[in-house]
Amino acid sequence: MAPPNKSSNRNKSNNNNNKNKVKSKKSKRSIDETPEALDLDQAAISKSIVYKRGDCNKGIKKLVKEFRQVMEPYTATKLQETSDNTTKDFVNIAAHYGVSHLVGFSSTDIGSYMAMARLPKGPTTTFKIQEYSFQRDVAKAKIRPTSFEKSYLNSPLVVLNGFTRGTPHLEMVQNMVQSLFPSINVYTLKLSTCKRVVLFNYNKETDNVEFRHYAIKVSNVGVNRSIKRIIQSKIPDISNLGDISDYVMNGLGATESDYEDANDGQVELSSKMINSKAKNIKLERKGLDINTTQKRAIKLEEIGPRMNLSLLKVEDDLYKGEVLYHQYIKKSDIEKEEAKLRRDEAKIEKERRRKDQEANVDKKIKEKERKRKYLDQGNEDKHSDDDDEEWYRKEVGENPDETFKNNRKSRSTGGGRPNKKFKSKK
């Protein structure tokens, strides 16, 4: 049998080492590109749970799933709730997972509703959903719908429009929406992570809040539309043309729905700012300068869903407490004071019942402890009787007779005294 070739084994080991080095480099690069590597304090990031309350129709169930996509990545995307789950169940698990907000959807025979609540002590804002559209409906209105899977790796930016100061309930809605999404630091924010925008627009004429969800797209400025189609997509079929200039000069690759370069949407950005770290490394390897600035056009493309919301009420606690604003019910100062007194009395009664319940629980625990000690003492007496019988067998060599057992019982019961007391005869 021929001896193994040492040189070939050495080459194989070197190849394996090189492969391991390549794998380690790739793994390090993938770790740097994860969205958790952002310059954000993970502990201070707003996290949410989007769920349905009670029995809902199919439309609201689908709207819940799509709104979870809006709140990604800091939400429970694969949450599976049932009709038996209550808000209290989600409040109990929220503290364990560091959840800061709850968004609940519900539907009745009258209409559909969306409630936003801040944990742990409120406030809660409840909206009535006047109209809504799904992502599918928005995509049908487009000529060329696109996919936005990679856009959900980072949280969206929030834009509030029309919320003027001086109106208390609108200011509370504004604060609620701002705290619902993670805050950003303009000095450390990477533009390459800005992929989506969420818009809340207050319409004074209809007194509704319009919700929209957009994707951010950046395109080059000053490039012919036909050239754009060649750069951004596959090369079109130009076999029936005599020269490439016919395609470019005649605008055969352009359509009416293509984006028009508007001056108000143009900014100067460098490749380093808008590209990811991995893409910038590839450009540097090709010898391209990523720090040179160019004019770019920013475009917003709607993703969906859409919602038109009307503010129904604002509560100062978690789904309860004082109603600070109600769309239909207006109370006088006297009625507000009476309602406050009733809430205070209910709190006092609840606290009294809680203390009584705790006292009853402590009493039952002490009673169980007393019974346990009594049973343990009885078991010890039984074991001592067994030891006496064993001692008698060893010393005498016979089983104990009835006289020995009766004497032992009389000792254990206190000298043969009767357990029951009898009345003396007169």
Curated annotation (Swiss-Prot):
Q: Positions of the region Disordered?
A: 1-34, 339-426
What stretch or stretches form a coiled coil here? Answer: 329-373
Write out the entry's keywords from A to Z.
Coiled coil
Any one GO MF term held by the record is: rRNA binding
**SMART domains to which the protein is assigned, alphabetical:** Brix
What PROSITE patterns does this protein's entry cite? BRIX
What GO biological process terms are annotated to this protein in UniProt? maturation of LSU-rRNA from tricistronic rRNA transcript (SSU-rRNA, 5.8S rRNA, LSU-rRNA)
**Family stated for the protein in its record:** Belongs to the PPAN family.
PANTHER family per record: PETER PAN-RELATED, SUPPRESSOR OF SWI4 1 HOMOLOG
Annotated protein name in UniProt: Peter Pan-like protein
